[in-house]
């Protein structure tokens, strides 16, 4: 990996991490912390955005298929933004707290909705780009 690529990932990861921190905290304060809603929202929205970005790259190419876009947005920004490791830890903590149903819901719903969000983002771009100019 080049120095330039490392810097792109670093800066993107910093921005994505700050975005995750604020959005997750905001959602947690608004909805409550009885369930890890902040992490849930971040994971689903991050999945949607990465699907949208991949769709733009596949449909339009150009800047969306460049190494810079991939390193900064896909690896850095979205890698710093999404919180799969936090999701896993919170699922285990729910189990350890005796909240097996909430843990199972978190695991199943997050996996299902994140996959659907990627497909929706990707499919949405494919559909929008089919519109006559």
Swiss-Prot record:
It catalyses: fluoride(in) = fluoride(out). This is Fluoride-specific ion channel FluC 4. It is a multi-pass membrane protein. Keywords: Cell inner membrane, Cell membrane, Ion channel, Ion transport, Membrane, Metal-binding, Sodium, Transmembrane, Transmembrane helix, Transport. The chain crosses the membrane at residues 7-27, 37-57, 60-80, 107-127. It is found in: Cell inner membrane. Pfam families: CRCB. GO terms for molecular function: fluoride channel activity; metal ion binding. The keyword Membrane applies. Belongs to the fluoride channel Fluc/FEX (TC 1.A.43) family. Na(+) is not transported, but it plays an essential structural role and its presence is essential for fluoride channel function. It comes from the Bacteria. One of its GO terms (cellular component) is plasma membrane. Fluoride-specific ion channel. Important for reducing fluoride concentration in the cell, thus reducing its toxicity. GO terms for biological process: cellular detoxification of fluoride. Na(+) binds at residues 79, 82. The gene is fluC4.
